[in-house]
Amino acid sequence: MELNAKPRKSQEKLAEGLIPAVAYNKDNNISFALDRKAFDRAFRQQSTTGLFDITVEGGETFPALVKTVQMDKRRRTPIHVDFYMVTYGEPIEVSVPVHTTGKSQGEIMGGLVDIVLHNLSIVAPGPRRIPQELTVDVSRLNIGDHITAGDVKLPEGCTLAVAADSVVISVLPPRMTADEAAAETQAAQVAGLVAAGELSEEAAAAVLEGDASIEEIKAEAHAAEGTQAEGSTEEGQQQ
């Protein structure tokens, strides 16, 4: 996509409707100004993976990718743009958005598809070979399954710039309700009391089935111990 720019000196006050921009690489640095509305429209179509051919009035035309866009927080409009100048035919590392397609088996069972890496770093063979997005089919994933960077199908000529075992997407188990979380906590507590010998298996079953609470079981056990102690005292006095 083409962008027309006006030359700009550092700290120069710009006319209404223009925003400052800079394009650079390891060997060059060019300052210029862009029409705010024209850039905003173009950027919405291209995003950070789209290639721009920038022509500076009275100067050269060069290819570049958007590096960063500074936005007006209140108006949500661009106020400054950094471009990275590239060279046709040379490999380039870029961060490409990851999108999913399909509905996973895990989702059908109540799970949640978690996109761990919303952008995947790859090396494209040249600026014109950069994909706008990477689409991943999640329809076969069950709860607990995941897709790594090595599983993602890349366009011909593109390679990963991250470890192949990096998790990109995973399917998480259903989120527990407050009641389910409380039940799980209680089960762990009961198991600990049984292991410590403070609760019998019969009493544990009663608690887990909702027939009694841990406090009630402990109170009954304490009362029984008190009754047993009183009986032992009476027997001693009779003797």
Curated annotation (Swiss-Prot):
Keywords noted in UniProt: Ribonucleoprotein, Ribosomal protein, RNA-binding, rRNA-binding
Region: Disordered, residue numbers: 217-239
UniProt GO MF annotations: 5S rRNA binding; structural constituent of ribosome
Pfam family, one: Ribosomal_TL5_C
InterPro entries: Rbsml_bL25/Gln-tRNA_synth_N, Ribosomal_bL25/Gln-tRNA_synth, Ribosomal_bL25_b-dom, Ribosomal_bL25_C, Ribosomal_bL25_long, Ribosomal_L25_dom, Ribosomal_uL5_bac-type
Keyword tRNA-binding: no
GO cellular component, one term: cytosolic large ribosomal subunit
Statement: the UniProt record of this protein carries the keyword rRNA-binding: yes
Compositional bias per record (Polar residues), positions renumbered to this chain: 229-239
Any one Gene Ontology BP term: translation
Subunit structure: Part of the 50S ribosomal subunit; part of the 5S rRNA/L5/L18/L25 subcomplex. Contacts the 5S rRNA. Binds to the 5S rRNA independently of L5 and L18.
Function comment: This is one of the proteins that binds to the 5S RNA in the ribosome where it forms part of the central protuberance.
Classification via HAMAP family: Ribosomal_bL25_CTC
Recorded family membership: Belongs to the bacterial ribosomal protein bL25 family. CTC subfamily.
The protein, known as: Large ribosomal subunit protein bL25
Organism: Deinococcus deserti (strain DSM 17065 / CIP 109153 / LMG 22923 / VCD115)
Organism taxonomic ancestry: Bacteria, Thermotogati, Deinococcota, Deinococci, Deinococcales
The gene coding this protein: rplY
